[in-house]
């Protein structure tokens, strides 16, 4: 149980110690006796010796801080005071640790030396994906120069504009190139329709030069089975024309007009046969190319179908675990 107030240690020990003791020694001794209760306070002489040993280890001229009492001269005795009265009202040496550095609130933070770094440039330097482009595929407008807000602390007197280091210029140029690359990726999200006539299959097809010569018109460009396209009329099957019945002409009627007409008919028949053979040769060479191309395309279709079935299986497993997309 706590003792009554009359039995406790008298109050003078809290305010001041015995004569010759340091001003703070009595207060510490009274506080300790108040906390210990019935225990007997220690002798002032031992406290005085410990106080002298502690002061001997400390430097002779501590740096005072704001709001603290200024210590007296170094050669003054520890028990000397400058005036009478209670220890709270007079100035003297302060018992307790002294500050050897300026206080935190007295430091002036270098707000003017802060450099602002672009977020996208920082992400690109560290190998991280940049921020997504704004909607519409438009490049973001350059942000105006930002001025740092001054701190409300007492040490901040003025703030200067942020300085841009020369290393930021290539980073911004890289950022612009990356922005254009992202815009290109956005435009390729919905691919434009591809003309089938412009698609070329990677294959090796070397036709016989004699076949190409028979398939080409003399004096014109060499027939190319890869690029040549036949019209619908040319691909239609030609009807078989019945040969006309041969008419026997007597020898006395074979005049010059007859031979002229006969010569013209023979020339027309020869031209028709040559054109028909040329067309047949072109179709045969073109068909050989298309057969080989068709075989390669069938192999590609089989590979694409296998890949599609694999990705469908992966998608079905993902949807079974995480739900539909």
Curated annotation (Swiss-Prot):
Compositional bias segments (type: Pro residues): 129-153
Determine if ATP-binding is one of this entry's keywords: no
Q: List the transmembrane segments.
A: none
Reported induction: Accumulates according to a robust circadian rhythm in liver and kidney. In liver nuclei, the amplitude of daily oscillation has been estimated to be >50-fold, and 2-fold in the brain.
Region Leucine-zipper, residue ranges: 283-297
Please describe the organ and tissue distribution of this protein's expression.
Expressed in the suprachiasmatic nuclei (SCN) and in most peripheral tissues, with a strong circadian rhythmicity.
Chain segments carrying region Basic motif? 257-279
Q: Where is the composition biased (Low complexity)?
A: 71-80, 88-98, 154-171
Task: Return the Gly residues bias intervals.
Answer: 17-28
Q: Which residues carry this modification: Phosphoserine?
A: 86
Family according to the record: Belongs to the bZIP family. PAR subfamily.
Could you tell me where this protein is found in the cell? Nucleus
What does the UniProt function comment say about this protein? This transcriptional activator recognizes and binds to the sequence 5'-RTTAYGTAAY-3' found in the promoter of genes such as albumin, CYP2A4 and CYP2A5. It is not essential for circadian rhythm generation, but modulates important clock output genes. May be a direct target for regulation by the circadian pacemaker component clock. May affect circadian period and sleep regulation.
Residue limits of the bZIP domain? 255-318
Q: What else is known?
A: Mice deficient for all three PAR bZIP proteins (DBP, HLF and TEF) display a dramatically shortened life span and are highly susceptible to generalized spontaneous and audiogenic epilepsies (due for example to the noise of a vacuum cleaner) that are frequently lethal. The down-regulation of pyridoxal kinase (Pdxk) expression in these mice may participate in this seizure phenotype.
Q: Which UniProt keywords apply?
A: Activator, Biological rhythms, DNA-binding, Nucleus, Phosphoprotein, Transcription, Transcription regulation
The record's listing under CDD domains reads:
bZIP_HLF
Quaternary structure, per UniProt, is: Binds DNA as a homodimer or a heterodimer. Can form a heterodimer with TEF.
**PROSITE patterns, A to Z:** BZIP (PS50217)
GO cellular component labels:
nucleoplasm; RNA polymerase II transcription regulator complex
Question: By what name is this protein known?
Answer: D site-binding protein
Which GO biological-process labels does this protein carry?
circadian rhythm; liver development; regulation of DNA-templated transcription
Q: Which segments carry the region annotation Disordered? A: 1-98, 124-203, 230-256
Q: Give one GO term, molecular function aspect.
A: DNA-binding transcription activator activity, RNA polymerase II-specific
Q: Does the keyword Chloroplast apply?
A: no
């Amino acid at each position: 149980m706590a003792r009554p107030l009359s039995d406790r240690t008298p109050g003078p020990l809290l305010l001041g110690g015995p004569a010759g003791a340091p001003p703070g020694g009595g207060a510490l001794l009274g506080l300790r006796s108040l906390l210990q209760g019935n225990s007997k306070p220690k002798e002032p002489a031992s406290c005085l010796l410990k106080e002298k040993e502690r002061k001997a280890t400390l430097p002779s001229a501590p740096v005072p801080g704001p709001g603290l009492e200024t210590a007296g001269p170094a050669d003054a005795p520890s028990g000397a005071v400058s005036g009478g009265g209670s220890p709270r009202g007079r100035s003297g040496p302060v018992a307790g640790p002294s500050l050897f550095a300026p206080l935190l609130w007295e430091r002036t933070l270098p707000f003017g030396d802060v450099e602002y770094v672009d977020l996208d440039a920082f992400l690109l330097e560290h190998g991280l994906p940049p921020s997504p482009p704004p909607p519409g595929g438009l490049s973001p407008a350059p942000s105006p120069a930002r001025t740092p807000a001054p701190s409300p602390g007492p040490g901040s007197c003025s703030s200067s504009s942020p300085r841009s280091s020369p290393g930021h210029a290539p980073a911004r140029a890289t950022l612009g190139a990356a922005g254009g690359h992202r815009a290109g990726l956005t435009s390729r999200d919905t691919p434009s329709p591809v003309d089938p006539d412009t698609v070329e299959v990677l294959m090796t097809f070397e036709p016989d030069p004699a076949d190409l010569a028979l398939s080409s018109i003399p004096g014109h460009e060499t027939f190319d089975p890869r690029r040549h396209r036949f019209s619908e009329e040319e691909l239609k099957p030609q009807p078989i024309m019945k040969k006309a019945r041969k008419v026997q002409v007597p020898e006395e009627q074979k005049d010059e007009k007859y031979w002229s007409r006969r010569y013209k008919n023979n020339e027309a028949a020869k031209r028709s046969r040559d054109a028909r053979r040329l067309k047949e040769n072109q179709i045969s060479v073109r068909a050989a190319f298309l057969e080989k191309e068709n075989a390669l395309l069938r192999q590609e279709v089989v590979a694409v179908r296998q890949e599609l079935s694999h990705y469908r299986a992966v998608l079905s497993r993902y949807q079974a675990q995480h739900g539909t997309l």
